[in-house]
Amino acid sequence: MKFSNYPITEEVKKGVEGMGFSKPTDIQFKSIPAIIKGEDVLGIAQTGTGKTAAFAIPIVDKVFRSSIKGRKDGVRCLVMVPTRELAQQIQEVFKSVSKFTTVKSFAITGGVEQDPQIHKLNKGVDILITTPGRMYDLISQGHLSLNRVNTLILDEADRMLDLGFYKDIEGILGRLPKHRQTLFFSATINAKIKKLAYSLVNNAIRIQISPKDPVSKNVRHYVTNVEMDDKRYFLENLLEQNAERKILVLVRTQVRAERVVKAMERVGVDSLIIHGGKEQSERNSALKAFKAGDCMLLIATDISARGVDIPDVEIVVNYDLPDLVENYVHRIGRTGRGKQKGEAISFVAEGEAPLLFEIEKFLGKKIQEIEVSKKEYQTILDLSNEKSLGDLLSQIEFDLENESPKKKRKQKNKKK
């Protein structure tokens, strides 16, 4: 079935066509008819399945139809997401779908000035995409009312729970009309997610898209056994061998991300960085530069990269192995998209062996090891452009010993 055959307005069809869509993906094919009918939906699907368009297309159509009939002002659809980047990305999809309609969508997140957001809300917004923190700030200050919301969407719900937003989500229910449509999307499902989902949805249609292979066949997986303190040298070596390829390096924490950036700076390698501690404008600029190819190296934390569309990534480097197997799948899902080929390279320290075991168990196969001999290992360290403290002290001593007599005389005269 083609999008042109769906019972949606011509304006929305035109927007979808402009996005280059002709036929729906599995999640879109199964979700859109149910959402159009007003059903609650519980969707289990991973990133990269077309999930955002699965709810954006029917919701824009729904809001647009009500505007034609003469709706009252106010937010009609609330979309809650875990991260700023995901909010911005979803906003872009809504913007594209609604391009030829009068529907107004807007993303509100922390990390940016609040006044422009308030100004935008006052002008009128139909679809609001938001992270919990900034939303509650605006509600408590009286700038945001949700009493006209007729559709609630939770996207990346599993990640929201990981980040501790359970009480925030529960708290929002009391501020929403009881009679509403609820769409709940998650990449994974477990007891806690089920509990939350069924507290929100009513007689929901459950849609689960489970690929036979949890990871793309277009991705080749490799591991290299590396001492924790030597990972930066191996990354430098990898970058030198793949200077023209777009590389995404994933780490566990913000501190770790900053350390990797500093390590690359010391050897003259340009890099971009995104994590939760950065201002939103900085994160947006970094993503824009990386997508444009202005810089070929992006260092990110799991949280900041989750759900974000980063096209044309050729190599994903697991600088640290993720704590959860599911995060390995999300990480390497950044490469090998569509018909493109990709590589996932994991630097594994001795203490990370149990994590690697769990990942291989999940994949159902051993990951190919890039074996490095002791000689090759030492060569990688020796060829690094980073100088050790001992090297720097030796260089200073050498410079002092070879300092010109004329310069020494000047320094003596200054002391006098």
Report residues per predicted region:
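Basic Arg/Gly/Lys-rich low-complexity intrinsically disordered segments
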Residues: 1, 69-70, 292, 370, ...
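Conserved helicase RecA-like core
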Residues: 2-383
